[in-house]
Amino acid sequence: MSCSGSLSTCTLDSGDLYYSFESDLPYSAWFFFKTMNVSGAEAVIAAASPFIGQGESACLVKPYVDVMTDSEIHLAMTSGFSTIAGSVLLAYISLGVPAQNLITSSVMSIPASIAISKMRFPETEEPITRGRVVVDRGEHGPDAPANALHAFSQGAVFGLIVAGLILANLLTILSLIAAINGLLTWVGQGFSINHLTLELIIGYIFYPVTFFLGVPRGEILRVARLLATKLVANEFSAYLSLQAIMQSDNPLSYRAWVITQYALCGFANLGSVGIQIGVLGAMAPSKASTISRVAFSAMICGFIT
């Protein structure tokens, strides 16, 4: 994720006069609203995710997060997992990934994430934003800021709360992963299996997935391990590993390289589960149980897209 936490949040809150993206966003959201038959809040979050990232896109409909249906929350999380944010684009470009591939992958993931999320978690309730596209960060409510300075202060306080929740959830999940890897390594030593970890196991599980992606047969296992690195660690670590492979004496073929670039693009990893739970949980405390319940399902859906 973009771990821009406090800064991104307070920037969104203080930008009601200066944030020009808001004026263009409804047009993009309207397209998905009309073509994908989703609620206005879902359309806004999905359309904004490739630009401002997971979690932060929900700030654009902040007053409605607390009254979202379970299906809407699932879609909001899925769209965040399936894309990257503009704030990390340059970092991936510096690793040798062409910008057009990253942007294309993120944009294509918007309708894909909507479709997969709705197949996995169909809407059974009536969303409050059904029939209208709405962009509302809460600047016109009873707690509306008096001026830009007040808005920045409110955003900073909220961002601090979000950052604390992100840190707590992220440390919990990363600690759990480390504990599982330690247990697997200990068990593996008893069976003479060196370095048995989640990444290794998931890499073999992803072998058929990588095959269906169209990767040449001789390179399937290497690409599958990169996908496992993305899921267990994060996409940045996976792109670093991809860069190392491409600079080695045995690089991937051009076809496998391009497919891998697209497959690794997105925030779908175990660490991001903690981030999204923290961000959305701060905006909608009453939905904390729902957010935690659908988080892993949304991550898998986001990974698929």
What is the meaning of each model-derived region?
Residues M1-V38:
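Hydrophobic alpha-helical hairpins/lids featuring a short glycine-rich hinge
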Residues G5-S14, S82-A91, S106-R120, N169-G182, ...:
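Hydrophobic core segments of alpha-helical transmembrane domains in multi-pass membrane transport
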Residues D16, S20-Y27, S39-G40, I52, ...:
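Juxtamembrane loop-helix boundary motifs flanking transmembrane segments in multi-pass membrane proteins
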Residues T35-S94, S109, A224-T305:
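Alpha-helical membrane segments and immediately flanking helix-loop junctions
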Residues V88-M108, V187-N194:
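Membrane-lumen (extracellular) interface motif
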Residues I103, V107-M119, G159, A163, ...:
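Hydrophobic transmembrane alpha-helical segments of multi-pass transport and channel proteins
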Residues V107-I110, I114-L160:
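Long, contiguous bundles of hydrophobic transmembrane helices that form the permeation core
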Residues V157-S248:
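Transmembrane helical segments that form the transport core of multi-pass membrane transport proteins
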